[in-house]
Swiss-Prot record:
Annotated organism of origin: Staphylococcus aureus (strain bovine RF122 / ET3-1)
Cell compartments where the protein resides: Cytoplasm
GO CC terms, sorted: cytoplasm
Keywords: Chaperone, Copper, Cytoplasm, Metal-binding
Alphabetical list of Gene3D superfamilies matching this protein: 3.30.70.100
GO molecular function terms attached to this record: copper ion binding
Alphabetized InterPro entries for the sequence: CopZ, Heavy-metal-associated_CS, HMA_Cu_ion-bd, HMA_dom, HMA_dom_sf, MerP/CopZ
Leader peptide range in chain numbering: none
Keyword Cytoplasm set for record: yes
Name of the protein this chain belongs to: Copper chaperone CopZ
Function: Chaperone that serves for the intracellular sequestration and transport of Cu(+). Delivers Cu(+) to the copper-exporting P-type ATPase A (CopA).
Length: 68
């Protein structure tokens, strides 16, 4: 199991948090995703044999947020 901390711009409310967490949790191989709105970060636990960081970034960007 691996962990990645992603910096995300544009998240400001509970809806943002829910949208990003849901998008990530729907990816096969992601075991948990937790958004911290205060610091604009997402902590993701995942199986790196099933999912790549680029797939997680794409899922976040598809929700309208920028991964920096």
């Amino acid at each position: 199991m691996s962990q990645e901390i992603l910096n995300v711009e544009g998240m400001s409310c509970g809806h943002c948090k829910s949208a990003v967490e849901s998008a990530l949790n729907n990816i096969d191989g992601v075991t948990s995703a937790e958004v911290n709105l205060e610091n604009g970060q997402v902590s993701v636990q995942y199986d790196d044999s099933k999912v790549a960081v680029s797939q997680m970034k794409d899922a976040i960007e598809d929700q309208g947020y920028d991964v920096v």
